């Protein structure tokens, strides 16, 4: 039984298999939702084909099931949501809240990486152009349920950022806002590497006139070199054997109550214990080394 007032989600991109850092985000969002008897959805963010690995999406779903993280309802695939994104782009254009930009990346790099609004009043057409938001509601700070008030970089918050790429692909910030609104997500629990784009997403909620969700940004898992575990730096995929010791490591990473007798529990019993004892206030805010690396070095 669920209380539908809370809807959370886990939204991986199929650029590779899930690793320990991915599990932290998935488990944290799952526990936050289940502890409130809420709904937990899964969305596959497959809108960037050049970065996708064939078969990765199916593997990700199998990994979630193997670790006992069963979602509610159907999986939402961003590759099937293009019409919704086109409608959102059309609405912004009709309201005068976006414009075409033909500035090359090299020009923006010369500006220090922050776009200066050069094309805002030039009335370009769509040929060989990106679409940028005409920033009306810059968000300078937001509340994170774990970290408190987070201040944004003023230049980044005020930038007219891209919502449709020159190569025809929909930008992440547009797609994620349209889909979170569509799915009724009330709180987004994800990794701290996504703190920076949050203010852009919040500004889009304001542009559309939609109610924004709450946010929780979990600590990042690092490798031995202090870099974030990611598919790009070849983080090892989650183990395919007994998921329980890995889940216990993830719970410890998240600062949760130690599960002393986990060897005597099934995966389902272990997760029920974790839900019953979940405390967001116990989650650390600083990044840390994956316990598997720490244990290996002892």
UniProtKB/Swiss-Prot annotation:
Residues annotated for Zn(2+) binding in this entry: 101, 103, 115, 119
InterPro entries reported for this sequence: Glu-Q_tRNA(Asp)_Synthase, Glu/Gln-tRNA-synth, Glu/Gln-tRNA-synth_Ib_cat-dom, GluQ/Sye, Rossmann-like_a/b/a_fold
Short sequence motif 'HIGH' region: positions: 12-22
Any one Gene Ontology molecular-function term assigned to this protein's record: ATP binding
Locus of motif 'KMSKS' region: 228-232
Binding site for L-glutamate: 9-13, 45, 172, 190
GO biological process: glutamyl-tRNA aminoacylation; tRNA modification
Cofactors named for this entry: Zn(2+)
GO cellular component: cytosol
Record-listed ATP binding positions: 231
Cofactor note: Binds 1 zinc ion per subunit.
Keywords: Aminoacyl-tRNA synthetase, ATP-binding, Ligase, Metal-binding, Nucleotide-binding, Zinc
Enzyme Commission (EC) number: 6.1.1.-
NCBIfam families: PRK05710.1-1, PRK05710.1-3, queuosine_YadB
Biological role stated in the UniProt entry: Catalyzes the tRNA-independent activation of glutamate in presence of ATP and the subsequent transfer of glutamate onto a tRNA(Asp). Glutamate is transferred on the 2-amino-5-(4,5-dihydroxy-2-cyclopenten-1-yl) moiety of the queuosine in the wobble position of the QUC anticodon.
Family according to the record: Belongs to the class-I aminoacyl-tRNA synthetase family. GluQ subfamily.
Identification of the protein by name: Glutamyl-Q tRNA(Asp) synthetase
């Amino acid at each position: 039984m669920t209380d539908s007032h809370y809807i959370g989600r886990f939204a991986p991109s199929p650029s590779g298999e899930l690793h320990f850092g991915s599990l932290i985000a998935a488990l944290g969002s799952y526990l936050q939702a289940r502890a409130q008897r809420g709904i937990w959805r899964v969305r596959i963010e497959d809108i960037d084909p050049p970065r996708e690995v064939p078969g990765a999406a199916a593997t990700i779903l199998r990994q979630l099931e193997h670790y006992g993280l069963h979602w509610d309802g159907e999986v939402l695939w961003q590759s099937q949501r293009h019409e919704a994104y086109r409608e959102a782009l059309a609405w912004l254009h009709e309201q005068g809240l976006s414009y075409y930009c033909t500035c090359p990346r090299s020009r923006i790099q010369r500006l220090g990486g922050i776009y200066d609004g050069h094309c805002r009043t030039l009335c370009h057409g769509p040929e060989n152009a990106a679409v940028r938001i005409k920033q009306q509601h810059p968000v300078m700070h937001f509340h994170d349920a774990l970290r408190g008030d987070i201040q944004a970089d003023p230049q980044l918050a005020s930038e007219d950022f891209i919502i449709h790429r020159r190569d025809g692909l929909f930008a992440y910030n547009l797609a994620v806002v349209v889909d979170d609104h569509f799915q009724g997500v009330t709180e987004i629990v994800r990794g701290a590497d996504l703190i920076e784009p949050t203010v852009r997403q919040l500004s889009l909620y304001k542009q559309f006139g939609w109610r924004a969700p709450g946010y929780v940004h979990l600590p990042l898992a690092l490798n031995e070199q202090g870099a974030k575990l990611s598919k790009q730096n070849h983080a090892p995929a989650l183990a395919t054997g007994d998921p329980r010791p890995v889940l216990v490591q993830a719970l410890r990473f998240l600062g949760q109550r130690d599960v002393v007798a986990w060897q005597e529990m099934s995966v389902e019993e272990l997760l029920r214990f974790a839900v019953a004892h979940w405390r967001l206030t116990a989650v650390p805010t600083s990044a840390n080394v994956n316990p598997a690396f720490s244990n290996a070095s002892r």
